[in-house]
């Protein structure tokens, strides 16, 4: 256990950030899952709608540093390609 006051503060800050990041990452996975489920159901309209909802969430997570910018770009690219297969 940390003995310095500053180290104790960092532990508290890290816990707060961990909970916040976990919440955002979980929401991110939900949005991605919604797009994939719509594609599996072969519902083009719902898939496009889900994709339009997912892209800003993915980009915001990258901006906040929760996921890497390249990972965000890769997710958007793959989801877009997946939705475009429906036509």
Swiss-Prot record:
Signal peptide residues on this chain, from the entry's feature table: none
GO CC, alphabetical: cytosol; small ribosomal subunit
Record carries keyword Membrane: no
Domain of life where this protein originates: Bacteria
Keyword Lipid metabolism: no
BP terms from Gene Ontology: translation
InterPro entries from the UniProt entry: Ribosomal_bS20 (IPR002583), Ribosomal_bS20_sf (IPR036510)
MF (Gene Ontology): small ribosomal subunit rRNA binding; structural constituent of ribosome
Coiled coil segments of this chain: none
Function: Binds directly to 16S ribosomal RNA.
Family, per entry: Belongs to the bacterial ribosomal protein bS20 family.
Protein name: Small ribosomal subunit protein bS20
Organism: Geobacter metallireducens (strain ATCC 53774 / DSM 7210 / GS-15)
């Amino acid at each position: 256990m940390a003995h310095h006051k500053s180290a104790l503060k960092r532990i508290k800050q890290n816990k707060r950030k961990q909970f916040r990041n976990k919440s955002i990452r979980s929401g991110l996975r939900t949005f991605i899952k919604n797009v994939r489920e719509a594609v599996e159901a072969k519902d083009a309209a719902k898939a496009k709608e889900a994709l339009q909802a997912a892209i800003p969430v993915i980009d915001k997570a990258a901006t906040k540093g929760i996921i890497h910018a390249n990972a965000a770009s890769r997710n958007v690219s793959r989801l877009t390609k997946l939705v475009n297969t429906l036509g």
